[in-house]
Every structure is written in C-alpha cells, then in structure tokens.
Amino acid sequence: NVRLRTNFRLGYEVMEGLNITTSLSADYSIARRNYFQPSYLDKDNWSQSVGETGINLMVLNENLIAYKKKIGEEHNLSLMAGISYQYDQMEYNGGYAKNSPSDKIYYAPGSLPTHTTQTSGGTTNTVLFKHYQSDMQEKSLVSYFGRIEYNYRERYLLTLAYRRDGSSTFGAGNRWGNFPSVAAGWSFSEEPFIKDNLGWLSFGKIRASWGRSGMHFDYPYLALGVV
C-alpha cells in the first residue's frame, strides 16, 4: 500500500485586519492485493489466484477572505467568506482465475482455460474459471459559505453563518442545498458581579444555536437511477 498526502497554503494581508488565503491539498492512495489459494483447500480441487488494485484520489481547494475589526473598546466584528471545491475519484480493477495446472503457479497466465462444465442432478452448468471486474467513480462538491461574528466586550456573542453546497451525487434539479445557522452566547464569567463574587469561577458561558445540516449520497451515481 502507498499513500501520499500534500498540502499547500498561501496567505496575504491586504491591509490591517483583511487577509486572503488559498489552500490546495491532495490525498492519493493505492492498494494492491495478490492472493493464492492452493487446490487442496477447495472442495472441487481447484486452485485460485486473486489480484486487486484500488486507487483513491481526493483534491480539495479552499479560498477564504477574512476581516477583523475592533470598534472602540467594546465592539468586535469578524467577517469571513469563502468558496471550496472538492473532487473525489475511486478506481478499482480486480479479478480471479481458477484451476491452474499446478499449485506452484501462483498467477494466472493467459493460456489457462476460461470455463468448464459440471453436471449435478441431471443439470449441466457452466463454471467460469476467469472473472474480471473494473469500476471507476467520480464525485465533486462545490461550496459557498460565509460567517459574521460579533461580540460586545467579549460577553455577548452573536454568530450568523450560511453555506450553500452543490453536489454531483444529486440530480440536476436538486443539486444544491442551503444551510443557514445562528448562535447567541453569554460569557457570564466576564460580568463584573460574577468576578467580584465568584472568584473561583474562571470561565462560564451559555450558548444557544440553531442550524440546518445535510449530507450527500455516498454512492456517486445513485440519482441517475437504474438503466
């Protein structure tokens, strides 16, 4: 098995409090399996050679712009917006061959027979000696998102967030989803009456939130239906 992971990030401060960042990451893995079962382990006295290769690739690009501003001594504002793109690809190739001439032949040369017949109860069936399977799947996800954070004296906090995702796993008429959220908090440990009377309390906070979440299909072509 081999796995390679890389990440690249670049940031630039346009002005005080305003930053732009872009990042690119990739995750690549390849797994191979070769397996041989000798004939004496099979009820039909057939050996079996199996070979499989699986390849997975994930690429993620994120682009963010963020702004932070302190207004006077009491107000703090933070803004963030971004776009991301994720691409996933899975590839599989595998197969098996049975009944090699000798248990010392671990792989399946092209000269091996492709099939045989078996008769049982007056019925003759064809048994395949060779089988091959391949698969390749792709899916992508595009996201637009933003967030506004405000707090007053680090005591009263408000967060508004919004995300819009588009996934290739859904049908063309239902590809996009919208996911808003809102949260409010109170850091009561920052209140003077708490500090004066409860010196042993280092931090205390109450937070309430609401949001909408979602997920996309694990199978990339489920929305296409059965042909």
Feature-to-residue mapping (PLM):
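Extracellular/periplasmic, surface-exposed regions of secreted and cell-surface proteins
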Residues: 1-37, 47-227
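Flexible, solvent-exposed loop segments that connect beta-strands
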Residues: 42-46
